[in-house]
Amino acid sequence: MKHYELLFILKPTLTEDEAKVKVDFIKEVITKNGGEIASVIEMGTRKLAYKIDKYERGTYVVIYFMAPTQLIAELVRNVRITEEIIRFLTVKYENKREISAWDKLSKGQKLMPAKKELKAPEKPVEAE
């Protein structure tokens, strides 16, 4: 099974209970089609970078999951027909480096930027 991340934005007009129902629906689509959910992160309501369908804000949700490849087509179909989802993005993690990042993100850990080696300043050569 492959590692995936699904980010979607719900309409801000939904109540907490309605938003939970939509998140549960997406989780159910994943599990019924052979996927395993690693974690669900509800990021809350945030301001959008630009208006989407007259909305300036949206409720962000990220789901980290493992699934067979054929599940993605069914998941995308269900997300598209859900009117309360105004945008979504599915990301596939492929190589070992990406999968280790997926593991950290799914556990709620932040990724640390690669450390840069600092060179000591060279001493100027004195002329004799």
Curated annotation (Swiss-Prot):
User: Origin organism of this chain?
Assistant: Campylobacter fetus subsp. fetus (strain 82-40)
Query: What is the recorded name of this protein?
Result: Small ribosomal subunit protein bS6
MF terms from GO for this chain are:
small ribosomal subunit rRNA binding; structural constituent of ribosome
HAMAP family, per the entry:
Ribosomal_bS6
Among SUPFAM superfamilies, the record links this protein to: Ribosomal protein S6
Cross-referenced InterPro entries, in alphabetical order?
Answer: Ribosomal_bS6, Ribosomal_bS6_sf, Ribosomal_S6_plastid/chlpt, Transl_elong_EF1B/ribsomal_bS6
Pfam family for this entry, one: Ribosomal_S6
Q: Please, which domain of life does this record's source organism belong to? A: Bacteria
Q: Which UniProt keywords apply?
A: Ribonucleoprotein, Ribosomal protein, RNA-binding, rRNA-binding
Sorted alphabetically, the Gene Ontology cellular component annotations on this record are: cytosolic small ribosomal subunit
